[in-house]
């Protein structure tokens, strides 16, 4: 009986997201700034006020300065969750597969950084698998922003 309750609560948590598959992300949410905590310099992101930032709008040809549209894959990872840590090798393979396609961008969005792994440790683990692939990582700031937007149960 308890298993059913837990399963029901878990499944319901996935239904309360801002965006569902096929939804257009609002301009306000596209403009929300996320701190890049790893890989900015390898992805052409310039610091602003000493910080590296990105927005989802940076990859939208209607709103960015280049007019180029990108396919954006966002890997959602929690630093405390073992399966996310173990998934790094798979992500490196995906990143390596698309690294020569300038219109595909892959971002790892980290939540709960420092519990136990830092952004630097996460990036270094990527580099361990393939030193030629530089991941791009953002810090969700323990606010569960992207987690709640994209139906991950955050």
What are these regions (language model features)?
Residues 31-72, 93:
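A short beta-strand-turn-helix
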Residues 68-92, 113-115:
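Conserved redox-active cysteine motifs that mediate thiol-disulfide chemistry
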Residues 110-116, 140-142:
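Short beta-alpha junction loops
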């Amino acid at each position: 009986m308890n298993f059913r309750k837990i399963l029901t609560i878990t499944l319901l948590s996935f239904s309360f997201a801002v965006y569902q598959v096929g939804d257009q992300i609002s301009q306000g949410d596209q403009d929300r700034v996320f701190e890049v905590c790893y890989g900015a310099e390898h992805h052409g992101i310039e610091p602003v006020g000493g910080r590296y930032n990105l927005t989802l709008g940076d990859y939208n040809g209607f709103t960015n300065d280049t007019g180029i549209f990108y396919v954006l894959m966002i890997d959602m990872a929690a630093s405390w969750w073992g399966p996310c840590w173990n998934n790094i090798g798979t992500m490196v393979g995906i990143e390596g597969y698309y690294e020569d396609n300038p219109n595909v961008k892959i971002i790892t969005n980290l939540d709960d950084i420092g519990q136990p792994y830092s952004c630097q440790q996460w990036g270094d683990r990527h580099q361990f698998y393939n030193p030629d692939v530089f991941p791009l990582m953002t810090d969700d700031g323990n606010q569960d922003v992207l987690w709640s937007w994209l139906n991950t149960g955050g």
